[in-house]
Every structure is written in C-alpha cells, then in structure tokens.
Regions:
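Active-site rim beta-loop-alpha module in soluble metabolic enzymes
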Residues: 60-61, 65-120
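Gly/Ser/Thr-rich loops at beta-strand to alpha-helix junctions
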Residues: 5-18, 30-36, 55-59, 129-135, ...
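Metallocofactor- and cofactor-centric catalytic cores in central/energy metabolism, strongly enriched
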Residues: 1-8, 20-22, 114-116, 122, ...
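Long, charge-dense
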Residues: 32-81
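Interfaces and regulatory segments of ATP-dependent nucleotide/adenylate/phosphodiester-chemistry enzymes
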Residues: 126
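A C-terminal functional module that forms or caps the active site or interfaces directly
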Residues: 108-114, 131-139
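C-terminal functional extensions of proteins
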Residues: 129, 133-135, 149-170
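Short, acidic/small-residue loops that bind anionic groups at enzyme active sites
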Residues: 20-44, 141-159
Length: 170
C-alpha cells in the first residue's frame, strides 16, 4: 500500500506471526508491545524485572520463551513477571467479545498491579501485552510511578523514528 511505513499488530499473541510476516514484506514489522522489551531491558539493573500484563497468563506463558527468542532475548525468562487479567472482575468481557465496563475493570486492574508491585518490588517497568489494557495505562503510571508501555507506545516508537525532526535541516 502506498504510504505505509511499517506493519503493526496490537496483541502479544501476534508475536507468533512476527517472523512469518517479516519474511513477506520489506517493511518493518512490529506485531506486539513485547517487541519493546529488548529496548527496555538495558534501562534496568540486572536484578530488576519487566512485568508483562496479559489478558490471560495461562495462555501467554507457554509461548513467551519463543516470543522472547524472536526479540533476541532467548533464555531471559527470569527477567520477566507475567500477570494475567483473567480474574479481574469485568475483564472476561474482553474474551467474550462483550462490552467492557471500564470503571469495574479499572478497579480490578489497580488492585492487580498494586499486588504485583508488592509481590515483586523488583519490577521496574510494565508492558501491557493486551490491547484492551492501554486504556488503563495512565492510571497505572499514576499509582505505581513506573513506566508503562503498550501497543500505542510500540507504534509511537516506530512512528517517531520515521518523523522529521523540525529542529534539523532536511
């Protein structure tokens, strides 16, 4: 397509298609916010971790080592904490393709993230793998003081790299 600079996905599970899609095009391909993890990892001390929030941790965990390998982070599972939202009240609407009650879900996400930080004080960065979680990113940043990255952050990162810098000559 004319004017397309890259191909993006918005769900961590799209990482399963990263290599296939990359081979089909000459465009940059970034199918998941999980692809930001190699960039985020060097900001942390070796003892610190990245938490990946996902719609369903039971489904994501078995495939995460392969996804991390695709990102160049093979053998790095110990640097990640995976937390699922499958038990957050109201979040089941996502899996059921129903309307989500954001107020109900926000309360559950807050509790989940605060518990995560209490259980894992070594978590210093949050990556929202699920597209639906982006709506809660600002609140999570506010209550944790931690950086939060999601599908929008992933796309913005690439887009900013393609944008002209108005302060520099062409």
């Amino acid at each position: 397509a004319q004017g397309v600079a890259g191909i993006s996905g918005d769900c961590g599970f799209m990482m399963n298609y990263q290599e296939f899609i990359r081979k089909q095009t000459k465009l940059p391909v970034f199918m998941s916010s999980i692809m930001l993890t190699p960039t985020l990892m060097p900001m942390l001390n070796p003892s610190e971790k990245i938490a990946i929030l996902t719609a369903n941790s039971v489904n994501l965990k078995p495939g995460l080592p392969k996804m991390l390998k695709t990102c160049g982070l093979e053998g790095q599972m110990d640097r990640f904490v995976v937390v699922g939202c499958q038990d957050v009240p109201g979040f089941e609407a996502v899996a059921n393709a129903e309307k989500v009650d954001p107020t109900k879900v926000m309360s559950g996400i807050e509790k989940l993230v605060l518990q995560l930080i209490e259980d894992h004080p070594d978590v210093k960065v949050l990556v929202f793998e699920c597209t639906e979680l982006g709506a809660y990113a600002n609140r999570v940043r506010a209550i944790t003081g931690l950086p939060v990255f999601d599908a929008i952050s992933n796309m913005n990162f690439f887009q900013r790299g393609m944008a002209e810098n108005a302060n520099l000559p062409k």
